[in-house]
Swiss-Prot record:
Region described as Dimerization: 263-380
Name of the protein this chain belongs to: Nucleoprotein
Gene Ontology molecular function terms on file: RNA binding
Low complexity bias: start-end ranges: 9-23, 189-208
Modification sites for Phosphoserine: S166, S190, S386, S421
HAMAP family: BETA_CORONA_NCAP
Residues where Phosphothreonine is found: T173, T425
Gene: N
GO CC aspect terms: host cell endoplasmic reticulum-Golgi intermediate compartment; host cell Golgi apparatus; ribonucleoprotein complex; viral nucleocapsid
Alphabetical list of InterPro entries matching this protein: N_prot_C_CoV, N_prot_N_CoV, NCAP_bCoV, Nucleocap_CoV, Nucleocapsid_C, Nucleocapsid_N
Sequence positions that bind RNA: R105, R121, R163
Organism name: Murine coronavirus (strain 2)
Length: 451
């Protein structure tokens, strides 16, 4: 009597047509349907455990269980004594013996052109089956780790049939309680085979006609995700992160300008202000109709650390439409030289209600107090976002410079001359007449009142 994993009290149900003369299952590739897809094509030599290339993607035999993948380099794959045999219903403890076989996976090309080898994946085979069916328990074989339960007799082979993929799906790998998984490894795809198994059982219960249609629907296109593809994508992402993670992203004037232009091209109600495009550039200056935002929040926009707690108060789209008073108003279009277009405003008014039981209530009140009508406190100060002066062309700037060079600049007036409008008194005129040799007061010093 041979045992079948996953079936209670199962007899020998193995398919003799899938066995070679030495009792080993036929070699195949990852997908169960590869052999059917290659019908009519040129036959290639089958790979064995000894001829499998180091970078190959071929799994020589079908394991009853999903694999265990290594994700950290330099880690050793080993289990404590009495541990490491996957558990499956229908297999007694005396037959829980076998080995883990290391499968070397293919390499991939990184963005910088280098080839990187994927870390290996391990598969379990019962003693007397798999790529080393003729080996005895404990033989020193490269890429093989022997495991057995305490009750198993390792001197005899396990009375377990080999898996026929047309009849049995792979079982997600599970271990007995207390088993310690080797560090740097994880169990691969615990639910990868379950959907196919359930759909197959449903198709069998529907009858022969539906069964044929169901099998045709399960055919995978050429672009379907392969088991190794997830690891390749993850490795590419990690390689990219490892290359750029230590380099802080620098914001240049050009990049800031691009971000600002991208934001301003959006409709006004879809803009999100930040450091590159402040609040007043997105929504205009603060005033009675737009009265929220202190100096710091106007500069940082949504990047302000206080903004997320305010965002919790923002209404949802449904609350906006169903909890507000809405009014559709038609506005005048642009000037006479602009094309005619209909412009509308959806004007709204509503309220956001909250009480002191709201988490972060005190912080919310503090932030609201600091930012509501903050423009009134800054009315006498310079605008936070002052418009930049228009750039002068090179020729215009040179002409301006020449004008300045050709003008004789008078000395600045003294404080007395700037602040006091003086009138000459008779005493002043007499004093000046004594100073001047000719005794005549210059016209420039005559009393303004006589002009």
């Amino acid at each position: 009597m041979s045992f079948v994993p996953g079936q209670e009290n199962a007899g020998s149900r193995s398919s003799s047509g899938n066995r070679a003369g030495n009792g080993i299952l036929k070699k195949t590739t990852w997908a169960d349907q590869t052999e059917r897809g290659n019908r009519g094509r040129r036959n290639h030599p089958k790979q064995t455990a000894t001829t499998q290339p180091n970078a190959g993607s071929v799994v020589p035999h079908y394991s009853w269980f999903s694999g265990i993948t290594q994700f950290q380099k330099g880690k050793e794959f080993q289990f404590a004594q009495g541990q490491g045999v996957p558990i499956a219903s229908g297999i007694p403890a005396s037959e829980q013996k076998g080995y883990w076989y290391r499968h070397n996976r293919r390499s991939f090309k990184t963005p910088d052109g280098q080839h990187k080898q994927l870390l290996p994946r391990w598969y379990f085979y019962y003693l007397g089956t798999g790529p080393h069916a003729g080996a005895e328990y404990g033989d020193d074989i490269e890429g093989v780790v022997w495991v057995a339960s305490q009750q198993a007799d390792t001197k005899t082979t396990a009375d377990v049939v080999e898996r026929d993929p047309s009849s049995h799906e792979a079982i997600p790998t599970r271990f007995a309680p207390g088993t310690v998984l080797p560090q740097g490894f994880y169990v691969e795809g615990s639910g990868r085979s379950a959907p196919a198994s359930r759909s197959g059982s449903r198709s069998q219960s529907r009858g022969p006609n539906n069964r044929a249609r169901s099998s045709s629907n399960q055919r995978q296109p050429a672009s379907a995700v392969k088991p190794d593809m997830a690891e390749e994508i993850a490795a590419l992402v990690l390689a990219k992160l490892g290359k750029d993670a230590g380099q802080p992203k620098q914001v240049t004037k050009q990049s800031a300008k691009e971000v600002r232009q991208k934001i301003l091209t959006k409709p006004r109600q879809k803009r999100t202000p930040n450091k590159q495009c402040p609040v007043q550039q997105c929504f205009g200056k603060r005033g009675p109709n737009q009265n929220f935002g202190g100096s710091e929040m106007l500069k940082l926009g949504t990047s302000d650390p206080q903004f997320p707690i305010l965002a919790e108060l923002a209404p949802t789209p449904s609350a906006f439409f169903f909890g507000s008073k809405l009014e559709l108003v038609k506005k005048n279009s642009g000037g006479a030289d602009e094309p005619t277009k209909d412009v509308y405003e959806l004007q709204y008014s509503g309220a956001i209600r909250f009480d002191s039981t709201l988490p972060g209530f005190e912080t919310i009140m503090k932030v609201l107090t600091e930012n509501l009508n903050a423009y009134q406190d800054q009315a006498g100060s310079v605008d936070l976002v002052s418009p930049k002066p228009p750039r002068r062309g090179r020729r215009q700037a040179q002409e301006k410079k020449d004008e300045v060079d050709n003008v004789s600049v008078a000395k600045p007036k003294s404080l007395v001359q700037r602040n006091v409008s003086r009138e000459l008194t008779p005493e002043d005129r007499s004093l000046l007449a004594q100073i001047l040799d000719d005794g005549v007061v210059p016209d420039g010093l005559e009393d303004d009142s006589n002009v």
